Amino acid sequence: MAQGKNKRLSKGKKGIKKRVVDPFTKKDWYNIKAPSTFENRDVGKTLVNRSTGLRLANDYLKGRVLEVSLADLQGQEDHSFKKVKLRVDEVQGKNLLTNFHGFDFTSDKLRSLVRKWQTLIEANVTVKTSDDYFLRLFVIGFTKRQANQVKKTTYAQTSQINQIRKKMTDIVVREASNVTLAQLTAKLIPEVIGREIEKATQNIYPLQNVYIRKVKLLKQPKFDLGALLALHGGATDDNGKKVNREFKDVVLESV
């Protein structure tokens, strides 16, 4: 006789439901801190499972890449089309210390810049900052009508495009290779490099809407906790202070 599973005996009682466990009871909230380069350092919060056994929460937090609107970091709606990527490098208590990981424009902003009767000029440059970060910067610019121009179109010649692209490359290398990553980030916010390119190319062909539209992190140096804490203005944990006691222990010479 074949031995098999008795379905009638193995059936559970009807009406008994499994206990539903809220998954959020096993998770903790962590505060995300942006570098001091930005006006608003409180980016938001993120969830992670609590440490259990060999699975540490810090291992799942470090390396997370977050995409934040620059308008939220600066408190200005003018930067709403700019996106900043922040990478979690260190966990201190319930605070996550982040560093710059990338920069980009929204797709709708890029589409709104492209118009008829003008020439789009792009360039990309790989630079090394003074603190050994390798970055690739993507520049975009558009020709505009010259003063007293009657013709509708503003198409640049191939020789002019090559000259403008050479100017873009030289200015980006000059502005980015002699500064730290934090200083370069500060230049990206007010579009300092874009205005420099517009001034330098005025004699070749007038440009408008010149931006660093994207920054890609290619390679980073070895992690330095001291440099990260300096970027965040010191440690974020609330450390206690030493208390000076007014009394001293009395030692009895004889009992």
UniProtKB/Swiss-Prot annotation:
<keyword id="KW-0689">Ribosomal protein</keyword>
<keyword id="KW-0007">Acetylation</keyword>
<dbReference type="InterPro" id="IPR018281">
    <property type="entry name" value="Ribosomal_eS1_CS"/>
</dbReference>
<comment type="subunit">
    <text>Component of the small ribosomal subunit. Mature ribosomes consist of a small (40S) and a large (60S) subunit. The 40S subunit contains about 33 different proteins and 1 molecule of RNA (18S). The 60S subunit contains about 49 different proteins and 3 molecules of RNA (25S, 5.8S and 5S).</text>
</comment>
<dbReference type="InterPro" id="IPR001593">
    <property type="entry name" value="Ribosomal_eS1"/>
</dbReference>
<feature type="modified residue" description="N-acetylalanine; partial">
    <location>
        <position position="2"/>
    </location>
</feature>
<protein>
    <recommendedName>
        <fullName>Small ribosomal subunit protein eS1</fullName>
    </recommendedName>
</protein>
<dbReference type="GO" id="GO:0006412">
    <property type="term" value="P:translation"/>
</dbReference>
<dbReference type="GO" id="GO:0022627">
    <property type="term" value="C:cytosolic small ribosomal subunit"/>
</dbReference>
<keyword id="KW-0963">Cytoplasm</keyword>
<dbReference type="Pfam" id="PF01015">
    <property type="entry name" value="Ribosomal_S3Ae"/>
</dbReference>
<keyword id="KW-0687">Ribonucleoprotein</keyword>
<dbReference type="GO" id="GO:0003735">
    <property type="term" value="F:structural constituent of ribosome"/>
</dbReference>
<dbReference type="InterPro" id="IPR027500">
    <property type="entry name" value="Ribosomal_eS1_euk"/>
</dbReference>
<comment type="similarity">
    <text>Belongs to the eukaryotic ribosomal protein eS1 family.</text>
</comment>
<dbReference type="GO" id="GO:0005829">
    <property type="term" value="C:cytosol"/>
</dbReference>
